[in-house]
A protein has these predicted regions:
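A short, solvent-exposed beta-edge/loop patch
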Residues: 109-176
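Sec-dependent bacterial lipoprotein signal peptides
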Residues: 1-19
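Post-signal peptide N-terminal segment of mature Sec-exported envelope proteins
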Residues: 29-48
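Short, solvent-exposed recognition patches
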Residues: 62-127
Length: 176
């Protein structure tokens, strides 16, 4: 390698390093206001709620049995787990809903809120133990918001937010 090549390489390296040594103030912020799948529908289709069939809901929550007494804009489930534990679950999708609105309602009802990101979607969990350990996980999705609410009937212990987030994750991962 010639002395000229080494000198040019040295000057370029110094100029490049000097140009990159710039500090930017502030705090990085996540982009808000968009969802990864703005045109996707999460409504009740083909006997599935939130794109999940009953067996997927049952397997996701480790239940022995699942009953869906109501389906439509809102779907209700009653699951039984080993040890005589009954779990009440509700799915809802509001196609023109707002994550901000759902968050405000949860706060007004006294829920403990926690911001989360689920499958690249802005979301939050809302824990509110009134008639049993209960939690919802809600995300901006498609044109609106979807939510899974889980309550351990008659139980004051456990973390239903884990199960609500599992169902939300399964929904956001689903392909029609």
């Amino acid at each position: 390698m010639s002395a000229l090549t080494v000198a040019v390489a040295g000057v370029l390296a110094t100029a490049t390093a000097g140009g990159c040594a710039h500090t930017v103030g502030g705090t990085a912020q996540r982009e808000e206001g968009s969802v990864p799948d703005p045109d996707r529908s999460y409504g009740y289709v083909d006997d599935r709620c939130g794109l999940l069939d009953d067996s997927t809901v049952q397997a996701t929550l480790g239940a022995d049995n699942v009953i869906r007494p109501y389906s439509g804009a809102v779907c209700q489930y009653i699951l039984s787990r080993p040890g005589s534990v009954t779990v009440d679950v509700t799915f809802s999708w509001f196609d023109a809903g707002s994550l901000t609105r759902e968050r405000e309602v949860a706060a007004q009802r006294g829920a403990v809120l926690k911001d989360v990101v689920v499958e690249r979607h802005q979301a939050f969990s809302a824990r509110r133990d009134v008639t049993g350990a209960a939690c919802s996980a809600t995300a901006a999705a498609g044109t609106g918001v979807l939510s899974w609410w889980v309550q351990y009937r008659g139980q004051k212990t456990g973390d239903p937010c884990v199960d609500a987030v599992k169902l939300l994750t399964a929904t956001l991962r689903s392909d029609m």
